[in-house]
C-alpha cells in the first residue's frame, strides 16, 4: 500500500486554500472532473493577464482509459470546434502540471492533442507530462507516449518539489501529499508555454487530459490558460473565428539557478501569452 507523506507544518500554514471554482469549463466538454479557479490556489497562480485558469484532475475522474495512452482513471476536456483560416497560424496556451504521485512504477501523466474536426483524426500530440523521479517531466517519458509536436518553453521542464509543492485543491485529498517522499517525482512544473503552427486551414478541436497510472491513488491534475489560435481565444467558440492576427511571442530566458527559475517562468509566461 502506498504511504502518504504529509508536511503538517506546510498544510497547517495553508489551511485556508483558495478554492473559487465552478462546475466544469464553459465552452468545453468534460469527461470526469474539471473546473475554473479565479484566484491563486496553492501552488497554481493566476497569470497577470488573466482573471482565472481552467483545470482538470484525476480526483473525481472516470474509471478506465479516458482517451490518452493507457491508465486506470482520469479526466479530459475537449474544446468546441474552432476555425483556422490561415496556414501556419500559431495555436498557443500555457499549462501547469501538478502531481502527488511518484516513481516510475506509477507514472501519472497529462497530454494535449489537436484533432481535425472534419474526421476526428489526430493531427498532433502537442505535449505530454509524466511523473519522473529524475530529469524531464515535460516532455513526458515512458512506453507508449509519442513525441510531442509543440514548441514548449522551457524546452524541458522538471517539477518544483518539496513540502508544499502539491498543495492544490483540485487534487482533493491528495493535495499536500506525496507518494513515498519528495525525491520520487511529485510536485509541480509551474507554468509552461506551448506553441504549435497549424499547417492547413480547416476546423479543429483541442483535448487536454490527465490520467492515473498503475493505480487510482495519489491524484494528478493540470491547469491551463490562454488557449488561442493566431491570438484569438478559442474558448466559447463554436463557429468560425475571424482572420487571425499575428501573435507576438516574447522570448523566455532559462534560469541559470534553480532558485530563480520559478520567478523567471512566472514573469515570462505572461509575455508568452500576450497577444
What residue ranges belong to the model's regions?
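Bacterial N-terminal signal peptides that target proteins for export
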Residues: 2-9
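Conserved short hydrophobic patches within well-ordered secondary structure
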Residues: 9, 52-54, 249-255, 275
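Bacterial N-terminal signal peptides
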Residues: 9-17
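Sec/Tat signal peptide C-region and signal peptidase I cleavage site
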Residues: 17-23
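Aromatic (Trp/Tyr/Phe) and Gly/Pro-enriched flexible surface segments
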Residues: 24-238
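A short, hydrophobic C-terminal helix/tail in secreted or cell-surface proteins
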Residues: 242-260
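C-terminal membrane-anchoring or membrane-association module
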Residues: 257-275
